[in-house]
From Swiss-Prot:
Top-level lineage group: Bacteria
Statement: the UniProt record of this protein carries the keyword Transport: yes
Family of the protein in this entry: Belongs to the complex I subunit 3 family.
Protein name: NADH-quinone oxidoreductase subunit A
Gene: nuoA
Catalytic class of the enzyme: translocase
Intracellular or extracellular location(s): Cell inner membrane
One Gene Ontology molecular-function label: quinone binding
Length: 143
């Protein structure tokens, strides 16, 4: 290695170490201190814990997360198509139109079933029951 390359690597290492030490010292001198009995409680840093860590979430949060991931991955497919649009031509355009049409149908179906509806419907049949089991949403005593 030449002398200039060694100086560049050495100055990078010295600068990185100096930056790390500087940030640690700033945190030590400028940071607050806690001397309470909750100092060693995990993840709380001296603040009294409130509540239980085992909080339950509604299933609707997981449904929204799954729908987000599905549509996000499909967005990646559309990005890949948009990068290679010249190679695919009209056939690729028609395939993407069919793909987007299927996406829109699935989004309309999810809206119809009530995935995005967060109201409680305790006395009504859900639309999923009426679609799969054959129950009518108009007649509540249908069995």
């Amino acid at each position: 290695m030449q002398e200039t390359e060694c100086c560049g690597v050495l100055s990078y290492i010295v600068g990185s170490v100096f930056l790390c030490v500087f940030m640690l010292l700033c945190g030590y001198f400028l940071g607050g201190r806690s001397y309470s009995r909750f100092k060693n409680v995990p993840f709380e840093s001296g603040i009294k814990s409130v509540g239980d860590a085992r909080a339950r979430f509604s299933v609707k949060f997981y449904l929204i997360a799954m729908i987000f991931v599905i549509f996000d991955v499909e967005g990646i497919y559309l990005y890949i198509w948009s990068v290679s649009i010249q190679e695919t031509g009209w056939i690729g355009f028609i395939e993407v139109c069919i793909f987007v049409f299927i996406l829109l149908i699935s989004l309309i179906y999810a809206t119809y079933v009530g995935v995005f509806n967060w109201k409680n419907r305790l006395n009504e049949y859900s639309r999923v029951d009426s679609l799969y089991i054959g129950r009518s949403k108009f007649f509540k005593n249908d069995k």
